[in-house]
Amino acid sequence: MNLMEINACILEELMDKKIILCVNVKGYFQELDKKYHVLNRVAFVVDNYDRKQGYTECEGYRFPVYSFDYLNNINIDDYLILITSEYYEEVYRQIKGMFPDHINTTIYHYADARIHYYNYFSNKFKEKPLENKIIFCSGAKKAYNIESGEFDDNSLALFEYMLENKLNMTYQLVWVVLHPEKYTQKYSQYENVYFLPYRWSESKDTNERRTYYENICLAKYFFFTQATDIATHRREGQIRVQLWHGQGIKSRALFTHDEYRYEYMTVMSEKYGDLHAEIFGLRQDQILVTGNPKQDWLYHPLDKRIFDVLGIPKADKYVFWLPTMRDSKTEVLSDDSINSDTGLSILEDECQLDRVNEQLRQSNMVLVIKRHPFEKCNTHMVKTYSNIVILDNTMLSDRNIHINRLLGYADALISDYSSAAIDYMLLDRPIAFAIPDLDAYKSSRKLHFDNLGEWLPGIQITTESQFCDFIKEVRDGVDSGKKLRQNAFKKLGKWRDDNNCKRVLEALHII
């Protein structure tokens, strides 16, 4: 077998053959049809993910979607097999592994604009040595045009650590973002720091395209939090590191086999290393047990004057609540849906919030609720309560504030399924888990642990009364969940320090 990029001449030459598309990616189908008008020739689609099988529709066409095993039922020489994925080499390996070595069929792949340009420039720069250049990226795929989280999380923590330790004098530090102008001024005093517009990856301007791919093709290291689309392919010697968002109690919604999508993934402990190797399809030697860079922020919170900027009043004690915020109109429980007038679990109506607010007022305590990034803002909740402050994602992202930069001031934390609770566990302070919908949530989202109570680093609360009791415990300095937290740390944790960034860079021999 061999792999070749499809083009108009090949499609015309093989006009008599029906097409099999691998894999089910509608965006690729649309682009493919716009360029070559071939969807009318498609026989079926193959995809190994169960949730993508069945049928798919695109541009008025409806195709059956089978697993890859279906290819064993046909004579593949009768078809034109066309890979529709940015990870076309990975898909090709899967297909090739299904057939004997003597099969001499050519497998084709469609290259979108970014892949086409990358292939061109990687060939152009292949004789140039790699440079002391590190690329950073954070958040969802830039192709989705989602700004939220694009300059944040573990990638940002590692970047700022490198600046603090003057590693920008050894390496060029380059961020791929949607809007460089938002960040350029803040870091203008640093040498060798650049912000590269993602749009240049498909720019019509030759110089912009060249600049973008010269950085991508010659960088030694890539660090990303979540999406890997800036480095779906690499040349020999380049190292891609998946920092992810952290480790929590919920698993991934969709398994992907990431073994060839990056070289390493960082985790906070051996237990999470085993879990992530399984759910990301990685080898054990790809797991770096270093701790998560953003956990260092817990030990170095921002100047407390930021509370004035965020409208957080002075108090004797602060309890932070990081709920998985939910939409009251959605029936299926997930990361962004729950039946509640307030969008909160447990405190589901304003009367309950009134009672909790009064308890906080009498105790000179403040409850800080940090919204889920995708939750719509209920501004009346912000204005109504004297001792309850609600922070939405925009308030923080506009000021480049990650929640871990504030949690160092939290005397206690209330969470549910967020990885922030596992981060906060390192500070060894009280944690409560507001999970009244546990059974329903498990039916919609897989968790790492079946016997969850044995793994949680804190007590479980399911009612308003228990919520208020936890507030009282914090007020009185009672820590009823201490043993639970200690037991959980023994199983899930490893370090309680601010050296995670350092360990990541040491593991990669950057320092």
Please tell me what each predicted stretch does:
Residues 220-247, 398-445:
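A donor-sugar binding/catalytic signature common to diverse glycosyltransferases
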Residues 122-123, 127-154, 304-376:
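Active-site donor-nucleotide binding/catalytic segment of nucleotide-sugar enzymes
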Residues 26-27, 133-300:
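Active-site and donor-binding regions of nucleotide-sugar-utilizing enzymes
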Residues 197-200, 204-219, 373-422:
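Donor nucleotide-activated moiety binding/catalytic core segment of transferases
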Residues 249-253, 260-344, 373, 480-487:
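A nucleotide-sugar donor-handling region in carbohydrate enzymes
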Residues 384-386, 392, 417-492:
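Catalytic binding pocket for nucleotide-activated donors in carbohydrate/polymer assembly enzymes
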Residues 172-193, 322, 326, 353-396:
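Catalytic donor nucleotide-activated moiety binding site of glycosyltransferases and closely related
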Residues 1-124:
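Hydrophobic, well-ordered beta-alpha structural blocks that scaffold small-molecule cofactor pockets
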